[in-house]
């Protein structure tokens, strides 16, 4: 891609990332994502447009509110950078197409879910349930999956985790996986097809185990420490989106 195109796509992604930050903060609290306009969560001062430029405004303000000087979480910039990078990566793979629009929306939903789950230990139905429907509808024009793949992915993704959660609760007598994770994997399957369920779960399980072990070693965390699984599922889905074909070919020797 030309440098100008990369810069434009990245800038577009960061603008969407700025909006995702609003969703991440407001959706768990049941607040509107369109009103009121952006404001400081500490002093409630409105954020002027020139203080709301993705990444740049954070750096120019030194990571603090212009009005009250309270520190702004660096997570805002991380979301904007991540969304911008995903936009560039998807544009590189899919180009200017309906596929780019659909899978960028999917990636944006995964970013939103990841940071909400990290902060609140929930995955809002307002994202995952419409996401399943959108994924199934998008399969009609997607170059990566067929409608049958999407349907089997949604049913298989949700069904696999539902079975795991049911078995865990029966054996251990406690909930081991929330309903949000089940619906998230169903959404992933709807967008990426039934083959994605294998890669997503493999990556999520390995990454989750490594992080859990690291926390127990370095922070002396309890073995029963609850770690949100949604971010690992989202990570696994993105790995499949970009590398799934090669992973499956390597794993099955084809």
Protein language model regions, located:
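Alpha-helical membrane-inserting segments
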Residues: 20, 24, 86, 90, ...
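Long, highly hydrophobic alpha-helical transmembrane signal-anchor segments
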Residues: 1-28, 125
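C-terminal ends of transmembrane helices
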Residues: 21-27, 62-70, 110-120, 163-175, ...
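Functional transmembrane core segments of multi-pass inner-membrane proteins
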Residues: 9, 99-207, 249-254
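Interfacial loop-to-transmembrane junctions
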Residues: 178-180, 213-239
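Membrane-proximal soluble regions of multi-pass membrane proteins
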Residues: 20-75, 229
């Amino acid at each position: 891609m030309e440098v100008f195109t990369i810069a434009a796509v990245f800038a577009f992604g960061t603008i969407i990332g700025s909006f995702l930050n609003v969703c991440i903060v407001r959706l768990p609290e049941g607040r509107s994502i369109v009103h009121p306009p952006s404001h400081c969560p500490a002093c409630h001062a409105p954020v002027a447009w020139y203080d709301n430029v993705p990444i740049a405004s954070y750096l120019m303000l030194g990571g603090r509110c212009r009005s009250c000087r309270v520190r702004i979480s660096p997570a805002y910039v991380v979301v904007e950078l991540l969304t911008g990078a995903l936009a560039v990566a998807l544009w590189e793979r899919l180009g200017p197409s309906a596929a780019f629009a659909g899978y960028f929306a999917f990636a944006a939903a995964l970013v939103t879910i990841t940071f909400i789950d990290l902060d609140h230990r929930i995955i809002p139905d307002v994202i995952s349930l419409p996401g399943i429907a959108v994924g199934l509808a998008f399969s009609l024009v997607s170059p990566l999956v067929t409608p049958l793949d999407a349907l089997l992915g949604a049913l298989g993704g949700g069904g696999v985790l539902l079975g795991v959660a049911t078995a865990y609760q029966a054996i251990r007598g406690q909930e081991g996986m929330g309903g949000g994770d089940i619906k998230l994997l169903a959404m992933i399957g709807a967008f990426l097809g039934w083959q994605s369920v294998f890669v997503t779960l493999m990556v999520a399980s390995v990454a989750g185990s490594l992080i859990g072990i690291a926390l127990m070693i370095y922070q002396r965390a309890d073995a029963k420490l609850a770690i949100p699984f949604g971010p690992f599922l989202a990570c696994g889905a993105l790995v499949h989106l970009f590398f799934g074909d090669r992973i499956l070919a390597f794993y099955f020797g084809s």
